[in-house]
């Protein structure tokens, strides 16, 4: 029997937590930055409107403001983020005792042995978890559902925000093969650039490479 793995990724986590205290800013570009008062430091997180303006995580504040002059900068509150992360993880723990955190805002849940307790429908359970986190904590997440951890993570990245994507035995080739090779876990910018020099730009092209 295939395993049933969820990868849960909280959307724009730092920014989303800050916006719980600033609901009036939800529709404007917002970023959490290292030192917004002095305009030094880097962008730690951004919301969807800021993302649409081209603001990127890890770029400098001045670069972000150049792209998006009306960007609202908020200071980081790391203790608060840990508190919300713990609350979300406590919800996950109610569905499986096989939860594995991946950073402060991502987790894998192996629900293989507990799925039958919640109706047996993996997508329905993923949706229920999303809706519960949103209802109880005011945060959205994307969930990838698959038969292994790598594909589950690709699924959570496939559609954002607040969405569930199922990558199954039946559809995985049509979803996974066309994705950029950089979407793979642990394939960073340097590796992606090197692979590109050999004409490998998609996961499917990488899979077709000879092992030699």
Task: Write out the residue ranges for each language-model feature.
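Gly/Gly-Pro- and Ser/Thr-rich, intrinsically disordered tail segments characteristic of DNA damage-repair
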Residues: 1-212
């Amino acid at each position: 029997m295939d395993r049933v793995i969820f990868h849960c990724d909280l959307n724009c986590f730092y920014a989303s937590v800050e916006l719980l205290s600033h609901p009036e800013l939800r529709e404007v570009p917002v970023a959490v930055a290292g030192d917004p008062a002095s305009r030094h430091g880097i962008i730690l997180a951004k919301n969807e409107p800021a993302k649409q303006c081209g603001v990127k995580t890890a770029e400098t504040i001045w670069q972000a403001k150049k792209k998006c002059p009306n960007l609202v900068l908020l200071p980081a509150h790391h203790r608060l983020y840990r508190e919300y992360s713990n609350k979300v993880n406590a919800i996950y723990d109610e569905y499986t005792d096989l939860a594995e955190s991946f950073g402060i805002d991502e987790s894998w849940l192996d629900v293989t042995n507990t799925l039958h307790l919640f109706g047996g429908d993996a997508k329905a359970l993923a949706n229920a978890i999303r809706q519960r986190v949103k209802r109880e904590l005011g945060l959205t997440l994307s969930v990838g559902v698959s038969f292994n951890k790598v594909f589950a993570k690709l699924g959570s990245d496939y559609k954002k925000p607040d969405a569930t994507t199922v990558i199954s035995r039946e559809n995985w080739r049509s979803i996974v093969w066309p994705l950029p090779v950089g979407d793979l876990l642990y394939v960073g910018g340097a590796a992606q650039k090197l692979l590109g020099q050999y004409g490998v730009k998609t996961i499917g092209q990488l899979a077709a490479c000879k092992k030699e």
